[in-house]
């Protein structure tokens, strides 16, 4: 099950089973949506939109599913944020999120899932960049169409979001040159 299509298909099916009627849609963004996915360097970027807050016991089931699927993902893994529909349109910045996951958080979840679920919520300026990519280049994997869920993100929010992501590029380029260089190119391309 290591292909992008198989992983996203399984993710959608299991998300529908766990989130049921609360699920608005699942949206692919990043390199996989823009046709430049590289199994060696890319993660699988997903935005999951729900109608209302997710109870902790459902978050636990959901996270267990994500972690299980993440084992089959490329080495950079799955990165996802779960947001409520009411922060997508009208767009709220910084954007509140219900849940977030990436490989950077895997160890924390595995060591203390209850703490992770309790604390992994808040706001994230980076979501403005993700919403922008979804709006312009994203793919709807299931649920409502992109333009029916997302409002176009204002330029100043997008620029603030990407600035927050690249402001430490001079140092971070040593650790993750591909990511930083591609992010800087994305900034220039958007102008």
Question: What does each of the following model-derived ranges do?
Answer:
Residues 1, 52, 170, 174:
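Active-site oxyanion-binding pockets that recognize sulfate/phosphate
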Residues 19-20, 40, 74:
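Short, structurally constrained coil/turn elements
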Residues 1-27, 57-58:
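Helical scaffold of the NTase/Pol beta-like nucleotidyltransferase catalytic core
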Residues 12, 16, 63-70:
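Short, well-ordered alpha-helical packing segments
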Residues 28-64, 77-84:
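Catalytic metal-binding acidic patch
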Residues 189-191:
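Short helix-capping/linker segments at secondary-structure and domain boundaries
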Residues 67-174, 181, 187:
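Conserved NTP/Mg2+-binding pocket subregion across the NTase superfamily
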Residues 3, 49-53, 184:
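A short N-terminal beta->alpha junction/helix N-cap motif
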């Amino acid at each position: 099950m290591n292909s992008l299509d198989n992983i996203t298909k399984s993710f959608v099916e299991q998300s529908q089973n766990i989130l049921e009627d609360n699920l608005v849609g699942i949206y692919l963004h990043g390199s996989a949506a823009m046709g430049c996915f590289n199994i060696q360097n890319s993660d699988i970027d997903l935005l999951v939109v729900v109608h209302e807050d997710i109870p902790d016991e459902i978050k636990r089931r959901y996270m267990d599913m994500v972690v299980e699927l993440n084992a089959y993902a490329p080495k950079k893994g799955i990165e996802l944020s779960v947001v409520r529909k009411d922060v997508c349109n009208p767009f709220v910045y910084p954007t509140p999120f219900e849940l977030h996951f990436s490989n950077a958080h895997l160890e924390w979840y595995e060591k203390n899932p209850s703490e992770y679920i309790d604390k992994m919520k808040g706001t994230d300026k980076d979501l403005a960049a993700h919403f922008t990519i979804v709006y312009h280049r994203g793919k709807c994997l299931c649920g409502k169409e992109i333009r029916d869920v997302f409002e176009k993100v204002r330029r100043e929010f997008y620029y603030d979001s990407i600035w927050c992501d690249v402001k430490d590029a001079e140092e971070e380029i040593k650790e993750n040159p591909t990511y930083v260089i591609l992010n800087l190119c994305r900034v220039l391309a958007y102008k």
